[in-house]
Amino acid sequence: MKTLHLSTATDITLAVRIWGDDNILAPTLVMVHGFPDNSLVWQTIAEQLSTIFRVVAYDVRGAGDSSIPKATSAYKIRYLVEDLAAVINAVSPTEPIHLIGHDWGAIQCWEAVTTPLLAGRIASFTSISGPSLDHAAYWMRQGLTQGSMDDKRKILNQLIHSWYIAAFHFPLASQLTWRVAFNKWPQMFSPIQALNLEDFPTQASDGHHGVKLYRANFIERLFKPQPRHTTVPIQLVIPTQDKFVTPALFDYLGQWASR
């Protein structure tokens, strides 16, 4: 593995990790982590995939060794997608890449495949436990206004699973939630999620600043969603033991993704 530091047009420095031999003409796979992780969460699988792909992962702004903007507005999804575009253009300037996103990584990748900035640059997208916020907002609206009782129960179930999002929108509550519930993320959530999570040196900082992702985006997308369609081939991975993202969020994905 090698690490490089990439400066973007908005004066953000991104820590980018690359696995695989640059001299091998292998397809490039870009992996985007979620909250409250950093790119090291991909290390084990990146090492395994590096035999067939040139694997790239980076710390998103506010996480790991990348820049940490102070303003909440700096964490809007459009800036995250600009960061992703900078990484893609740096590591694969001429060839389309394959994209994988988990949690908040998937959320921003949905934006990337449904907006013009990266048109033609993404060969495929694998989404793990993260919907488009716009798609999720439309799903809720349609379910509440036109859906069956079963649809409404699914929405209520998802809202119950998303309890922490409301807490993150209140400064004092979000700090308390993080310190009490999430500061020991691996120890607390490995048993719940049936995962073997590791501690990272920047874990507390990643969580503290990553909360701004929620504050910068959720309310706007919930009340002002935009129709976002894509022709990029999509592979959807739905972990069966995810305690925060329910499968129902993807019930009507076919109306947005044609492949």
Feature map (PLM): residue ranges:
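N-terminal cap/lid segment of alpha/beta-hydrolase-fold proteins
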Residues: 1-13
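Pocket-edge structural micro-motifs
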Residues: 8, 18-20, 238
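Generic detector of ordered secondary-structure context
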Residues: 8, 24, 34, 202-206
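Ser/Thr-centric signal marking residues that sit
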Residues: 8, 28, 126
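Flexible "cap/lid" subdomain of the alpha/beta-hydrolase fold that forms the substrate-access gate
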Residues: 12-14, 56, 63-100, 107-259
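Conserved HGGG/HGGXW glycine-rich cap/lid loop of the alpha/beta-hydrolase fold
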Residues: 17-65
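The conserved beta1-alpha1 loop
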Residues: 30-34, 102, 238-239
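Short active-site segment of divalent metal-dependent hydrolases/proteases
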Residues: 36, 105-106
